[in-house]
């Protein structure tokens, strides 16, 4: 097990080194030819965002000598870099000639609405299809929340958010993150606190379906966590995150009687400290919806029990490769995997595919627990629409981008579970394929409509609002 974890992590690091070497080669290539001096970088439209936050994202600085042959390409590269900040609805860079040897750049930005009070209605189930088919669209399984989020607190890209949620899951939360605490803008810190409780929860998996238990008027599961993190961002695309998290769980005796391994050995209380290190290499063109580039994410962590738990280590990995063919065709491969040790762990940590964004498309109705899993997604897309509605009569939504991508896709996956029981989709290969359409718009909005077949001969139309 340790060897597999080491090899996976070594693979991710090798990918990162390869991309960094390629970046150095590209930089050297740009250094040839006739050059002009970048005299000034002017910025317009940043009524809230500080100038240094924008300059931090750029690959050029005032005084740099830029190759004339690459000037437009560099301007577009930096426009995309600035747009990847979750702050702007539009970014434009104009090149202003000064004389034969000098140019200025004018960066024009349209700021988003940073203070976002949200009234949210979220489903407690894993996806909309599960809620409709298995829970008969029971509105009692919805969560009504009021969230206050400031995405550019004090103009420094700081985030401050608070949430109060009622309904199926009652939740209170507070989170703060300051991306830069130093003059070089490389080091950041953050902290968060969350509490939740439910009258109903799943206590086991049988036949790759969650089994639920409920006690009306009694909260049978409670969860509290507090976390702090440190982030080091030495360059534009590289990010290192170290996090320490305290987590406390309490379950009603009813859950323990139904599943003694829920927290392990019949315990109804679980307290742990969790420590993680995460490395991100993000060399894609658009962080919200990539179409070209490479993305590598590696996470290594361990959990130490303070009560009702021993020790668990894990490694998660993701490699995404995105390629554009011609002007309209897009191809992507996304590989994800997870390894944990030991195999004998509480049920609540024995998750693999079927929750969140980790699933083989076509198996959205199933939960596939496991201690290890691998998932590969392949997509071929066509850029049918790439336009924007301009001069919209709302200040913070003056430009509404609209992109539509018809696609075909195929997924394969495998989850290892030594305690599979009656679940029949574990410890075997899974495959799904289909066609669909992605719709992307402002404020990181994404909508995926997918019609999928799986190896069981089942088919259906699925709706998702998260990324692939």
Descriptions of predicted regions:
Residues 193-234, 337-371, 458-463:
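Outer-membrane beta-barrel translocator/channel fold
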Residues 34-192, 266-290, 372, 415-420, ...:
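Outer-membrane beta-barrel initiation region
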Residues 186-330, 411, 415-418, 426:
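Transmembrane beta-strand segments of outer-membrane beta-barrel domains in Gram-negative
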Residues 272-399:
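C-terminal outer-membrane beta-barrel translocator/porin domains of Gram-negative envelope proteins
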Residues 140-144, 168-172, 220-226, 269-275, ...:
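Residues that define the transmembrane beta-barrel architecture of outer-membrane proteins
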Residues 276, 380, 439, 458-468:
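Outer-membrane beta-barrel "beta-signal"
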Residues 120-124, 147-151, 163-167, 177-179, ...:
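Outer-membrane beta-barrel pore domains and translocons
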Residues 88, 112-114, 153-155, 181-184, ...:
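Outer-membrane beta-barrel channels and translocator barrels
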């Amino acid at each position: 097990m340790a060897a597999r974890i080491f090899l996976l992590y070594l693979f991710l690091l090798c990918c990162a080194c390869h991309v960094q070497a390629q970046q150095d080669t590209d930089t050297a290539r740009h250094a040839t030819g006739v050059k002009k001096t970048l005299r000034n970088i002017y910025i317009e439209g940043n009524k809230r965002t500080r100038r240094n936050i924008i300059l931090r994202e750029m690959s050029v600085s005032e005084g740099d000598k830029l190759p004339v042959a690459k000037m437009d390409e560099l301007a577009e590269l930096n426009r995309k870099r600035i747009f990847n900040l979750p702050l702007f609805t539009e970014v434009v860079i104009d090149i202003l000639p000064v004389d034969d040897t000098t140019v200025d750049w004018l960066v024009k930005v349209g700021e988003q609405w940073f203070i976002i009070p949200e009234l949210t209605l979220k489903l407690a189930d894993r996806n909309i299809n599960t809620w409709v088919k298995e829970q008969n669209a029971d509105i009692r399984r919805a969560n009504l929340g009021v969230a206050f989020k400031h995405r550019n607190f004090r103009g420094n890209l700081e985030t401050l958010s608070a949430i109060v949620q009622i309904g199926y899951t009652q939740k209170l939360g507070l989170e703060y993150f300051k991306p830069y605490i130093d003059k070089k803008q490389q080091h950041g810190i953050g902290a968060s606190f969350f509490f939740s409780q439910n009258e109903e929860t799943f206590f086991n998996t049988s036949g790759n379906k969650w089994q639920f238990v409920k006690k009306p008027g009694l909260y049978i599961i409670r969860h509290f966590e507090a976390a702090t993190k440190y982030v080091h961002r030495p360059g534009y695309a590289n990010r290192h995150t170290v996090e320490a998290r305290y987590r406390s769980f309490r379950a009603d005796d009813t859950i323990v009687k139904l599943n003694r391994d829920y927290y392990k050995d019949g315990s109804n209380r679980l307290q742990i400290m969790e420590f993680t290190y995460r490395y991100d290499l993000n060399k894609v063109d658009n962080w919200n919806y990539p179409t070209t580039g490479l993305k590598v994410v590696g996470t290594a962590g361990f959990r130490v029990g303070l009560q009702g738990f021993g020790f668990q280590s894990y490694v998660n990995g993701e490699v995404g490769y995105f390629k554009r063919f011609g002007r309209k065709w897009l191809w992507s491969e996304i590989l994800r995997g997870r390894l944990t040790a030991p195999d004998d762990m509480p049920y609540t940590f024995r998750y693999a595919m079927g929750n969140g964004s980790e699933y083989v498309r076509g198996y959205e109705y199933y939960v596939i627990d496991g201690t290890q899993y691998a998932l590969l997604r392949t997509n071929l897309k066509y850029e049918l629409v790439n336009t924007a509605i301009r001069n919209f009569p709302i200040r913070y939504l003056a430009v509404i981008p609209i992109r539509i991508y018809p696609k075909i896709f195929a997924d394969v996956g495998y989850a290892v579970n030594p305690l599979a029981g009656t679940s029949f989709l574990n410890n075997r290969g899974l495959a799904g394929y289909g066609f669909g359409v992605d719709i992307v718009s402002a404020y990181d909005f994404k909508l995926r409509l997918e019609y999928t077949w799986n190896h069981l001969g089942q088919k259906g139309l699925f709706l998702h609002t998260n990324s692939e």
